[in-house]
Amino acid sequence: MKLLPRLRLPYLFTVFGLLLTLGSCVETVENQQIVYFNNFSNLNLEGFENGKLFIWRNDTIAGYYHNEEVSVNVKDLPAHNFVKITAEILIHDSWDGNPDDGISGPDFWYLGYDRTELFRTTFSNSPCESTYCLYQSYPNEFFRVNRPKTGAIQTNLPGLCIFGAFANYTTRYQVEKLIEHSNPDIKIYMGAELIQENSPDPICDESWSIASIKVEAIQTNRK
């Protein structure tokens, strides 16, 4: 039988001390609370800039938007060092994703807070077959190549306008982002930069809306 080498006592104490140090550095959540939630069912747009509502499939949602930006101001947050933003959005009709042809794309959607753009991506509602597929970047930032509807939570909804009579032309996504933040107020904004030069009615061709938005304040044990 092969014996293991004898470890010196000082070495054991060094390893044990290192493990204790690492263990004490683990960041844990001390408090997490929802400070803002809106699914627009109560028609409340308090704190919104460019807020507007419409009813779609018997549900009240914010929108619909084209090349527009919308924001919500959330004030008097409790003590925190992180904020988690969760936005459920709907991508309507003929979004073309990544193609950069100056006629139909790229079709950008972005999310930010205060004066910082946090996330910029593209979405595509294109069919995807061996001979034709317009790729998107989501769930990654632009530029990445992913199949249309990658990361979606619902894909079989009908379009809103130009493809309103056809299934699979509205796609629902839940976008989640965690940011370091400690100020008592936060302004969250989202918007789109869409290109559709060959359409007489661009907003009917491509639009987006917001089904819900949630903001959570998180306090960890970080000093």
Where are each of the predicted segments found?
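Short edge-strand/loop segments of extracellular domains
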Residues: 101-118, 212-214
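Extracellular carbohydrate-recognition regions
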Residues: 26-52, 116-131, 220-223
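Short beta-strands within extracellular/lumenal beta-sheet-rich domains
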Residues: 64-86, 105-109, 169-177, 208-211
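Bacterial N-terminal signal peptides that target proteins for export
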Residues: 2-13
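Extracellular/luminal beta-rich ligand-recognition
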Residues: 116-157
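Terminal, low-complexity interaction segments
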Residues: 144-222
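C-terminal motif of bacterial Sec signal peptides marking the signal peptidase cleavage site
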Residues: 21-24
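Extended, low-complexity, turn-rich repeat/linker tracts enriched in Gly/Pro/Ser/Thr and Asp/Glu
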Residues: 90-105, 127-131, 196-200
